[in-house]
């Protein structure tokens, strides 16, 4: 899964882009605690499986 595909999943769940620091996009949710960080420096390649799992856990989707 590419960073853009992961971003689509996060945005569909209601997360909103908070800020961009270099190649890392950070998202916050109006009701869920914490932040989700997606690294975009890997594009157009797929995200590492462990990185993807971490993103989904941060978002409360896994």
Regions found by a protein language model. Name each.
Residues 14-19:
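Short secondary-structure junctions
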Residues 25:
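Positions that flank functional sites
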